[in-house]
Amino acid sequence: MSTLVCFHAHPDDECLATGGTIARASAEGHRVVLVVATDGAHGEVPQDLEPGETLVDRRAKEVAASAKVFGFARLEMLGYKDSGMTGWSQNSDPGAFINADVEVAAQKLAKILKEESADAVTIYDWHGNYGHPDHIAVYKVGMRAAEIAGTPNIFQMTTNRDAFRRMRDMAMKNPEIVSETQGIGDFDPDAPADDGNPMGEPESVISHRVNVEKYCDQKKLAIACHRSQITDTSFFLNMSDDIFKLAFGTEYFIKVGESGPARDRWLFE
């Protein structure tokens, strides 16, 4: 069996884009470790915080619950502050993850990679999939940490821009899908995202297409753990099983050192 370390930016990032891969790896008996870079302090603030409870407190509880759903063997928080989206005032906070010294942050992650004798680590693609500053920092720190630790396999999570476009065009022919996905037809995967680049990567550079339909129920359960960010009325939780599988039943990775196009492969082949 192998050890997989999943490095994410915020509590809840573990769910949608890599959750099926995590669930599958755990179910197959691999050791799976979650490392979260930031405290998620700049997410949605729920109305039901207890006296003295902060959003950071709540999100720490939520990610711990999600980790149990997925079967993580270990959860580590690096303790950096959430940087917020591009242009937010929080970007200038000295404690924000985007302002961390890459070498220092990478040493923290590398320590975990070494402790775990990690066979593989997941991070994000070069622009954080959709340009979020903290996601881009995960890429930079993750790449350096893997180099320091000698982790042999690096998988960069991404969105298949071409597959998303095909799904959108198909969905537009089905009113039920349009309704359940809250206007998917209005989303243009080729439009500039938070950093000015389109979301994800083209199919031609993606190495791994992972079918995780079998684990979509676990993904939903883990998403539901993050109640401060995703309410009962969220379309994520109210999609029919078939449409959820259509939208989130496949996950995509670029394995460093390998090329596309995307094809059906498992991380531990």
Identify the function of each model-found stretch.
Residues 1-117, 144, 148, 254:
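Active-site rim/loop-helix segments in enzyme catalytic domains that contact anionic ligands
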Residues 1-5, 90-91, 95, 99-269:
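Metal-dependent de-N-acetylase/amidase catalytic core
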